[in-house]
Amino acid sequence: MYRPARVTSTSRFLNPYVVCFIVVAGVVILAVTIALLVYFLAFDQKSYFYRSSFQLLNVEYNSQLNSPATQEYRTLSGRIESLITKTFKESNLRNQFIRAHVAKLRQDGSGVRADVVMKFQFTRNNNGASMKSRIESVLRQMLNNSGNLEINPSTEITSLTDQAAANWLINECGAGPDLITLSEQRILGGTEAEEGSWPWQVSLRLNNAHHCGGSLINNMWILTAAHCFRSNSNPRDWIATSGISTTFPKLRMRVRNILIHNNYKSATHENDIALVRLENSVTFTKDIHSVCLPAATQNIPPGSTAYVTGWGAQEYAGHTVPELRQGQVRIISNDVCNAPHSYNGAILSGMLCAGVPQGGVDACQGDSGGPLVQEDSRRLWFIVGIVSWGDQCGLPDKPGVYTRVTAYLDWIRQQTGI
């Protein structure tokens, strides 16, 4: 019987160093491949902005929709933003959709038209026409399921450059840097402000030296404190500057007129409010634009967060600082502020207190006239106070005292026509 010859096999072993090298090389190649894949899927993305104009067929326009400060404006804008957000978060674009913001409500016949800016993130190699088509498809679903908001179904979207999107958003008052970029992240933090963090803040300079703060409330008017002009109210001696640095400002503005409240009383700090009219209108940018005036009925509850900004001294009798600083404080009720151990009845109805119980965070010399602001649910900023007076700076139970802006809205409108 035929039997194949037995072949003697020789065992061969790879060098352990070679094995180790192959394993390590394989792991490295795999790691690099995964890293590149993660990068291109998660990080190699670009932001894209789109604008859509929604015609609301069953909402009648009225004067309360003129200002983002009114509850009616906030409610309607919030409903539209929530509807858009919910629609995209439940769609196949849930991971690409970032945020939507109503930039403006305006009259359209007897109805309302809402101009909305939306932000998405797609990988860079996505086709623009394809992205737009996908977004429009989702919006059409929304228009068919818009609840009790009747929206014209012929709505279309327009692609915007980053600058064009910013231009839409800065024309609305109170837009901070996170709103202008439609970012989901807050930029606040620390005590030294970043450029553009508080774009309405101005420095009022007497004979070219920083003297007081102020706030742009439109492109022609600055809101500030009356006591800033006790020594000199000649407009020719004043200029206003924008930017976080008083040494290297971004913009210089000449002053045409200074309007001080007729009933300002320096002894009691009553009616400590003034307006500065500029010689020329300001062209708004992402770093320079106005803060919102509040509605007369705006709620400013005790304990709520507010921010005060300025170039004032960091301690009582200290020197002003060249870079803008910010401080987080809490609103304090007038009853608490009027307690015997605090201001013992000196806080009047046209005043507002803010600080921290233990002291340490406060406005100080050089901050006078600057803004105390709060952010609403739509991330718009409103000026609720004007730095007015206080007992030294940052003492416990001696918070900063501010002019209550809601008490002077009629006066502001009479002077400015805003």
UniProtKB/Swiss-Prot annotation:
Membrane topology according to the record: Single-pass type II membrane protein
**Single GO cellular component term:** extracellular region
Highest taxon listed in the record's lineage? Eukaryota
Q: Which residues lie on this side of the membrane: Cytoplasmic?
A: 1-20
Name its GO BP terms in alphabetical order: proteolysis; respiratory gaseous exchange by respiratory system
Q: What class of enzyme is it?
A: hydrolase
Cell compartments where the protein resides: Cell membrane
Q: Which PROSITE patterns match?
A: SEA, TRYPSIN_DOM, TRYPSIN_HIS, TRYPSIN_SER
InterPro entries xrefs: Pept_S1A_HAT/DESC1, Peptidase_S1_PA, Peptidase_S1_PA_chymotrypsin, Peptidase_S1A, SEA_dom, SEA_dom_sf, Trypsin_dom, TRYPSIN_HIS
Q: What does the record say about tissue specificity? A: Located in the cells of the submucosal serous glands of the bronchi and trachea.
| Sequence ranges assigned to domain SEA in this UniProt record | 46-163
Keywords for this protein = Cell membrane, Disulfide bond, Glycoprotein, Hydrolase, Membrane, Protease, Secreted, Serine protease, Signal-anchor, Transmembrane, Transmembrane helix, Zymogen
Q: How is its activity regulated?
A: Strongly inhibited by diisopropyl fluorophosphate, leupeptin, antipain, aprotinin, and soybean trypsin inhibitor, but hardly inhibited by secretory leukocyte protease inhibitor at 10 microM.
Q: Which residues lie on this side of the membrane: Extracellular?
A: 42-418
> Using the chain's own numbering, where are the disulfide bonds?
C173-C292, C212-C228, C337-C353, C364-C393
In this chain the Peptidase S1 domain maps to: 187-417
Q: Which residues cross the membrane?
A: 21-41
Keyword Transmembrane helix assigned to the entry: answer is yes
Q: Which residues form the active site?
A: H227 (charge relay system), D272 (charge relay system), S368 (charge relay system)
Q: Enumerate the glycosylated residues.
A: N144
Entry's EC annotation: 3.4.21.-
What is a GO molecular function of this protein? serine-type endopeptidase activity
* Reported function: May play some biological role in the host defense system on the mucous membrane independently of or in cooperation with other substances in airway mucous or bronchial secretions. Plays a role in the proteolytic processing of ACE2. Proteolytically cleaves and activates the human coronavirus 229E (HCoV-229E) spike glycoprotein which facilitate virus-cell membrane fusions; spike proteins are synthesized and maintained in precursor intermediate folding states and proteolysis permits the refolding and energy release required to create stable virus-cell linkages and membrane coalescence.
Protein name per Swiss-Prot or TrEMBL: Transmembrane protease serine 11D
Give the source species. Homo sapiens (Human)
* Gene, per the UniProt record: TMPRSS11D
